[in-house]
Regions:
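Short acidic DE-rich linear segments
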Residues: 1-2, 62-70
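Short, charge/polar-rich alpha-helical segments
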Residues: 1-13
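Generic leucine side-chain signal with a strong bias for well-ordered alpha-helical environments
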Residues: 8-11, 25, 57
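Heptad-repeat alpha-helical rod positions in long coiled-coil/spectrin-like domains
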Residues: 13-16, 23, 27-30
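Amphipathic alpha-helical coiled-coil segments
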Residues: 18-22, 45-65
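Short, charged, amphipathic alpha-helical segments
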Residues: 36-47
Length: 70
């Protein structure tokens, strides 16, 4: 099992990656490189992953914060 701090850093990197993917997706849509259907499909996929990561981040921040009391 990974160290909690290490896992927290990994989640932060994943969050940044998803933000960059969304930015790139928006640029592609604005340049008309993808259809609206492709955009919506990929956007939903990224949003689901983002929500998962943010949920885990909140949990890990709580856990890491609790560990400082011991």
């Amino acid at each position: 099992m990974k160290d909690a701090q290490e896992y927290l850093k990994e989640l932060l990197r994943k969050k940044e990656e998803l933000e960059k993917r969304m930015e790139l997706l928006n640029k592609k849509k604005n340049k008309k490189q993808i259809t609206d259907e492709e955009y919506q499909k990929e956007r939903k996929k990224i949003e689901r992953e983002f929500i998962e990561v943010m949920d885990r981040l909140a949990q890990m921040r709580y856990i890491v914060g609790q560990n400082t009391f011991y």
